[in-house]
Amino acid sequence: GLPQGLADASTSLDRSRRAPAAGAAESERALHKVLVLDPAAGTGTFLSAVIRLIHARVAAGGDSGAWSDYVSNHLLPRVFGFELLMAPYAVAHMKLGLQLIDTGHDFRSPDRIRVLLTNALEGPHELAELPPFSGWPAEDADAAGERDRAPSIMVVLGNPPYSIFGQTPPGPWIRGLLDDYKTGLNERKLNLDDAFIKFIRLGQWHIERRGAGVLAFVVSNTFLDGITHRRMRES
């Protein structure tokens, strides 16, 4: 079990073994077992709550003097957010940075808040060089050779947008993932184009890549009993 929950700082070894054609041999690295992601972070409200909870857990352990080292080595490397718009992205960085300073963290040069200015629904390709996301594109990891992933728990949380109105059409990557929710459906109108459904599918993909996880979104409840959402529920 993980008695510290989101504050768990344990790591496990991740091994990658690529085929000779890929030009690389076996490699290994330590990955944290508990990873946290808000794929529509906005101004960082949910990530702020995560930091507040983790700080309380660490402080309850009676070693508050180690907090700054914990942030550098075990919080910032495994808590992530994605945000598409510049204004909330900037606010999130300021909010989370000030919050960590208020808790007593002393920012060092390598430290960075990992809220990324990116469209989470465009796929993992932009994140390929950023641990723990490196190697996530399936066509790289799966086709090139075998990969024994370190067991970890992916916590995907937040309050993604609900509606399709005013949005640009989804890209091919997320459209391909949504096909799993449409398999065998014969209805004329599927009602599977809302943004929150795309984010649920995205969260499912992240968890499947890691082997276990928790999906905690504030979303519309229409998928709970919608006729055309039955494949989504099964999945």
Task: List where the protein language model places each region.
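SAM-dependent methyltransferase catalytic region
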Residues: 1-234
